[in-house]
Curated annotation (Swiss-Prot):
Organismal lineage: Bacteria, Pseudomonadati, Thermodesulfobacteriota, Desulfovibrionia, Desulfovibrionales
Name of protein: UPF0173 metal-dependent hydrolase Dde_0151
PANTHER family: UPF0173 METAL-DEPENDENT HYDROLASE MJ1163, UPF0173 METAL-DEPENDENT HYDROLASE MJ1163-RELATED
GO molecular function: hydrolase activity
Entry similarity comment: Belongs to the UPF0173 family.
Amino acid sequence: MQHLLTWHGHANFQIATEGANILIDPFFEGNPSAAAAWQGIAKPDLVLVTHDHGDHVGQTVEICRETGAMMGAIVGTAEKLAAAGVPQQQVLNGIGFNIGGTVLHNGVAVTMTQAYHSSESGAPAGYILTLPDGFTIYHAGDTGIFAGMELWGRLYSIDVALLPIGGVFTMDAKQAALACRLLRARSVVPMHWGTFPVLEGNTARFKEQLMNFAPDCRLFDMKPGETLTLETASEGCACD
């Protein structure tokens, strides 16, 4: 089974798989790295938000209202977004869910993980998505490295990890490379870099550190607007 992973810049990813189209941290307006407007992307049926900072909430309310997509977030942040205009009936699990919990959406199991960051409501989080054929994607959200990544790597067979490398507000390149080893990730897509001058400007240091800490982890060095075709571990991957 094939899955399509599109990076819209920063922490904004879209995953298209059989029966589901999932958008994570839909920061389009005000995102200098976004290659498209939210009105021009494929229609999502689920929007996931890792925490309530503006560069991650983005246009969640507008997208959910326009498309009818469900919205998933931690309890507290889900309440805040419902108050901001996401229709209550579109909130996943009615009130959101919490760290360690799993909800099902159109054949995709969405598991919430912890993240070490800040958030005005709820708590920051990440997501492990187990697609219908078992292919597994981890979106770390904004986080520093934490020892519990090793536990998630033992619990789940992570095919692709989406990890921040920008530093200052999240992990830097060295921490993210070690995170790949803790997670036992088969491949990694670096994110949360290059969007603003304060962040790491490119992936060069991460490439170097990945060779030191997790040389068997395959690097997909995506550019904003690029789509990656993902397949089962026995098959190949290709960038469009």
